[in-house]
């Protein structure tokens, strides 16, 4: 059935106009953006399939090639979907500019949507001013943390250049398990020693997983 064949009061566009976006399901909102379906499936069916297969959160992180594996999603629609979520991420970043960090929860919330590929480990450095506000988020390395591969110079170089008062290390665990590995502990100790020499405080090292985090400071592993 085509969307045009729906009763007028059940069409997503008409319901949007009458009741606002909050009255629509995620699939209906996506259908309004993508607009047209195929001969076999109307766009609402396609959007329902997308969301039932992947969910909204996973959909936000899919690339163009992955999106096009779903019937009815070609290059143009894949780009539209990607553009929607990219705008949302940019709004999130804008709202969090100069956010004051009071604990690991703030770090976890700030980093939502910032890891480009959650199948790999990414190490980020957050630069903080004297008010503990984030002034910059810098990605330093991609891949498993290893003390022999991470040089303090690379971690502190931008912080020195921008006169950061302190930094926070953040990296993700693709497995979702936030328990630190021996390598994580070695890297933390190495950079803590370097911070004392450089006189830029290492406030915390936060490991983020799918639904939580581990803070070295909050677990008394970083005094």
Swiss-Prot record:
Q: Which residues form the MPN domain?
A: 100-222
Position of motif JAMM motif? 171-184
Look up keyword Metal-binding and say if it applies. yes
Write the record's keywords in alphabetical order, separated by commas: Hydrolase, Metal-binding, Metalloprotease, Protease, Zinc
Q: Which InterPro entries match?
A: MPN, RadC_JAB, RuvA_2-like, UPF0758, UPF0758_CS, UPF0758_N
Residue positions binding Zn(2+): 171, 173, 184
Which Pfam families did the record assign?
Answer: RadC, UPF0758_N
Q: What GO molecular function terms would the record report?
A: metal ion binding; metallopeptidase activity
Disulfide linkage = none
Q: Name one GO biological process term.
A: proteolysis
Which family does this protein fall into? Answer: Belongs to the UPF0758 family.
Matching entries from NCBIfam families are given as:
PRK00024.1, radc
The entry's protein name is UPF0758 protein Cvib_1178
The source organism is: Chlorobium phaeovibrioides (strain DSM 265 / 1930)
């Amino acid at each position: 059935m085509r969307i045009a064949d729906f009763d007028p009061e059940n069409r997503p566009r008409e319901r949007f106009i009458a009741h606002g976006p909050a009255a629509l399901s995620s699939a209906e909102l996506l259908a309004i953006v993508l607009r047209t379906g195929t001969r076999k499936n109307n766009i609402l069916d396609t959007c329902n399939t997308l969301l039932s297969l992947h969910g909204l959160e996973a959909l936000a992180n899919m690339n163009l090639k992955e999106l096009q594996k779903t019937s009815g999603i070609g290059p143009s629609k894949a780009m539209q979907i990607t553009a929607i979520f990219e705008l949302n991420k940019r709004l999130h970043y804008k709202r969090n500019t100069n956010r004051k960090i009071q604990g690991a929860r703030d770090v976890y919330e700030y980093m939502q949507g910032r890891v480009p590929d959650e199948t790999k480990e990414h190490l980020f450095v957050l630069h903080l001013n004297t008010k503990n506000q984030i002034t910059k988020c810098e990605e330093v390395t991609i891949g498993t943390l290893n003390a022999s591969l991470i040089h303090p110079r690379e971690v502190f170089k931008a912080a020195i250049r921008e006169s950061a008062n302190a930094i926070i290390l953040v990296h993700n665990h693709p497995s979702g398990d936030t328990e630190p590995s021996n390598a994580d502990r070695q890297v933390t100790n190495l950079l803590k020693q370097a911070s004392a020499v450089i006189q830029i405080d290492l406030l915390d090292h936060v490991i983020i997983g799918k639904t939580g985090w581990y803070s070295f400071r909050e677990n008394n592993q970083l005094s």
